[in-house]
Regions:
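Pre-Walker A-like glycine/lysine-rich segment at the N-terminus of P-loop NTPase domains
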Residues: 1-40
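Conserved P-loop NTP-binding catalytic core
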Residues: 21, 29, 38-88
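Pre-Walker A (Motif I) flank of P-loop NTPase domains
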Residues: 23-26, 184, 211
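Conserved ABC ATPase signature
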Residues: 31-33, 173-203, 219-223
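Extended helical coiled-coil dimerization/tether regions that scaffold
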Residues: 112-191
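Conserved hydrophobic alpha-helix in the ABC-type ATPase nucleotide-binding domain
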Residues: 230-235
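H-loop/switch region of ABC-family ATPase nucleotide-binding domains
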Residues: 249-251
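RecA-like P-loop NTPase motor core
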Residues: 257-318
Length: 318
């Protein structure tokens, strides 16, 4: 069954109809202000009741930050529309929940705030250090092209009270450190910004349920272009193994060029058009990075013989 969201008169979006694709990694790109963040908030609502409250912030002033539009969700012939009432609550027009029919176990929205840039202090260690899970060590080393994380340790800290169990493995109860000599370590507080952002992202992905929808804002955040490409390889493998649907918002040409599933959001007249399977060169050109599609070297030859000679010896010339 087709699954679709229609956003009307919300923030900068007058109208957008977005059809959800199947499993795999999908790149969503477009100019700033085209509606990527708004779309992610609407997608997050499929499994998160507080998505509108945390994503559509308001003030107490009567003429500021008003949301007068609507968000409609479709699964086949079924539909539910949410609007914001005078009470301040977002309410559906019908009392039936079609969100379960989207068939996602959960929706995980990894934005550029809070947990993405979180670093754990070492003020109150609770237990002796333990080796870090092999999957995390391998992923960090592989994506960052290093071996510095091979002996990384995990230290349980903070308040371990929890109703859900496994409190010692929660990110807020976990600190990481790397040994530099006998009985000497440096903690994650001294990791580079790119390292801590990647560590937190991987932690979130690993703790996501299979068959879930994952929304990642600005995947390239603080990462070298080569690391971005290796991270994309990792995410493609995770999506395949765990049946994940991953949406990534980005302006990174390195990321856009690595994926065939590029979705371009483009403002046309009075609406946001959605272009699926968009060629990377078109997407890059649309977001104003024309230089990234231009050749590094242009060689002009006199005739076909010169062209053949150049092609035969191209490696030594270029």
């Amino acid at each position: 069954m087709d699954r679709k969201i229609i956003i009307s008169q919300i923030r900068n979006i007058n109208y957008m109809a977005f059809k959800l694709p199947g499993e795999g990694v999908h790149i969503i790109t477009g100019e700033n202000g085209v509606g990527k963040t708004t779309l992610f908030t609407c997608l997050s609502r499929i499994c998160n009741n507080n998505a509108y409250r945390t994503g559509f912030l308001t003030t107490n002033l009567s003429n500021y930050d008003k949301y007068m539009g609507s968000i409609s969700y479709f699964v086949g012939d079924e539909k539910v529309t949410y609007t914001k009432r005078t009470s301040g609550r977002w309410q559906p027009d019908v009392n039936k929940n079609i969100f379960k029919k989207f068939n996602y176990k959960s929706v995980v929205h990894i934005n550029t705030k809070n947990e993405r840039i979180f670093t754990q202090s070492m003020d109150t260690p609770r237990r002796n250090p333990k080796p870090v899970d092999v999957w995390l060590i391998n992923a960090m080393n592989s994506i960052l092209n290093t071996d510095k994380f091979s002996n990384m340790i995990r230290i349980t800290v903070g308040d371990l009270r929890s109703r859900t169990g496994n409190a010692d493995k929660r990110r807020r109860n976990t600190a990481f450190a790397i040994p530099i000599s006998r009985n000497r370590y440096y903690t994650e507080q001294n990791f580079s910004f790119g390292e801590i952002v990647l560590l937190n992202l991987l932690y979130d992905i690993e703790n996501t349920e299979d068959n879930s929808l994952v929304l990642i804002d600005e995947l390239e955040m603080a990462l070298h272009p080569a690391a971005q490409v290796r991270l994309m390889d990792y995410l493609n493998e995770m999506a395949k193994q765990r049946h994940l649907t991953v949406f990534i918002s980005t302006h990174s040409t390195s990321i856009i060029k690595t994926n065939k599933n590029v979705i371009l959001l483009e403002r046309k007249s009075n609406e946001i058009k959605v272009f699926y399977k968009c060629p990377p060169a078109k997407a890059i050109g649309t977001i104003g990075m024309r230089e990234d599609t231009m050749a590094d070297i242009i060689v002009i030859v006199e005739d076909d013989m010169a062209k053949a000679l150049f092609n035969a010896d191209r490696k030594s010339v270029v």
